[in-house]
Amino acid sequence: MRKCARIIYNPTSGKELFKRTLPDVLIKLERAGYETSAYATEREGDATLEAERALKRDYDIIIAAGGDGTLNEVVNGIAEQPNRPKLGIIPMGTVNDFGRALHLPSDIMGAVDVIIDDHTTKVDIGKMNNRYFINLAAGGQLTQVSYETPSRLKSIVGPFAYYIKGFEMLPQMKAVDLRIEYDNQVFQGEALLFLLGLTNSMAGFEKLVPDAKLDDGHFTLIIVEKANLAELGHIMTLASRGEHIKHPKVIYEKAKSINISSFTEMQLNVDGEYGGKLPANFLNLKRHIEVCTPKDIYNEELTEDQQVEDGIIEEKPSNEEIIKNNEISE
């Protein structure tokens, strides 16, 4: 029986490269046994609505072709449904944080090959109030860099554009009094920014969460406390090497649920796009979405449960089984 695939793509992403390559993508998927159709988004929110429609038509897989914003919209269209289809990703944005985290090929046909191989990984997603995200949520002036960086600069220098814009914004940064409740702990004080990460890659920084796991049911919470300009510049430099977590002005924690509030207005960034303002409640939805990934995805980025499921390692016996085996051997 042929499987049904629905491609939801942003025709303007990647200088319209996917739009021009679409006929070849459709042929390749058809030859691999997929009955495939495609939908081009026209405005903000289109990908979410189309993903919801695709669910009603019982597609086996939804393929998001575009940048992190398109992917976020597709995830929001399927996250609330109990029977979610598999998610395929063809990264077409400038940075493609989530695609980088999954080590997806940067070329279109390579990404299609990953989908055809049909190896999947169940990954965590986050819920912020009534919307979902798949990579990060953040607050603070510096977190606005992803949607304030000019498109022309991104097209010229790629992810390095965020570094340039980030250093440009440092002198404007002001600390805000925040209350952050996470699991059984509380941070109360002045902070310049906070980040909730689900993967290791955010705004081009691939080592921002050096110990990230895609499926452990926890956010990585990073809080940068009030600091001077020199300290901030040092933290940004350290972040490019994954060494910022040792800085005395950086709080680095793991948490399943987080509540953040402030008496001062603070904008939120969700998967690289404007996400409203505080207050916000965050909840990690463990292994909520099944995503097509390369077969050689790094094992250290997955929990033991996923590695057992993939056949990478054998399941460890329970304490009861160990005791029973010992009794038999005696």
From Swiss-Prot:
- For the ligand (ATP), the binding residues are 10-14, 41, 67-73, 94
Any one GO CC term of the record: plasma membrane
Q: Which UniProt keywords apply?
A: ATP-binding, Kinase, Lipid biosynthesis, Lipid metabolism, Magnesium, Metal-binding, Nucleotide-binding, Phospholipid biosynthesis, Phospholipid metabolism, Transferase
Reaction(s) catalysed by this chain's protein: a 1,2-diacyl-sn-glycerol + ATP = a 1,2-diacyl-sn-glycero-3-phosphate + ADP + H(+)
Sorted alphabetically, the Gene Ontology BP terms of this entry are:
phospholipid biosynthetic process
- Which residue positions are annotated as catalytic? 273 (proton acceptor)
> Which EC number(s) does the record attach to this protein?
2.7.1.107
Cystine pairings recorded for this chain:
none
Q: Which residues bind Mg(2+)?
A: 213, 216, 218
Q: Which NCBIfam families match?
A: PRK13055.1, PRK13337.1, YegS/Rv2252/BmrU family lipid kinase
**Similarity annotation:** Belongs to the diacylglycerol/lipid kinase family.
Listed under subunit, the entry gives: Homodimer.
Q: List the protein's name.
A: Diacylglycerol kinase
Species this protein is from? Staphylococcus haemolyticus (strain JCSC1435)
The UniProt gene name for this protein comes to: dagK
